């Protein structure tokens, strides 16, 4: 009986040790804040300017690094700063949509960074009508 009690106590101590980890220091990590997370082109004509920009600010206390930015399809091309963004500074991700493709579109751009919110998904949408 004492062996079972000792075993149960050891198990409880082991499990509680797993949950006794030090809290993360989220306040000292970078925070990525976008002015907007979506852009609506509305209805545009085939071949029109498909460029838009997503401005963001590093709200953290250390340099922000955008590790990767990728679009949901090859018709959307993102450009992003490769150098670290200093605390309090702003920059932007430029997106070009291929407006040669006629029809409604709804695409996503996934931003991966070293921020607390390390994955942010941006959206673009619109409707491309044929040239007349």
List the predicted regions and their residue ranges.
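Bacterial Sec-dependent N-terminal signal peptides
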Residues: 1-24
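Long, low-complexity ectodomains and other extracytoplasmic segments of secretory-pathway proteins
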Residues: 20-48, 55, 116-132
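Short, solvent-exposed loop/turn segments enriched in Ser/Thr/Gly
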Residues: 37, 47-53, 100-108
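Short strand-edge motifs at loop-to-beta-strand transitions and within beta-strands
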Residues: 39, 89-95
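Asparagine-centered strand-capping/turn motif at beta-strand->loop junctions
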Residues: 56-60
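Short, hydrophobic/aromatic beta-strand segments
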Residues: 62-69, 121-123
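Short, solvent-exposed loop/linker segments at beta-strand-coil boundaries, enriched for Pro/Gly
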Residues: 72-79
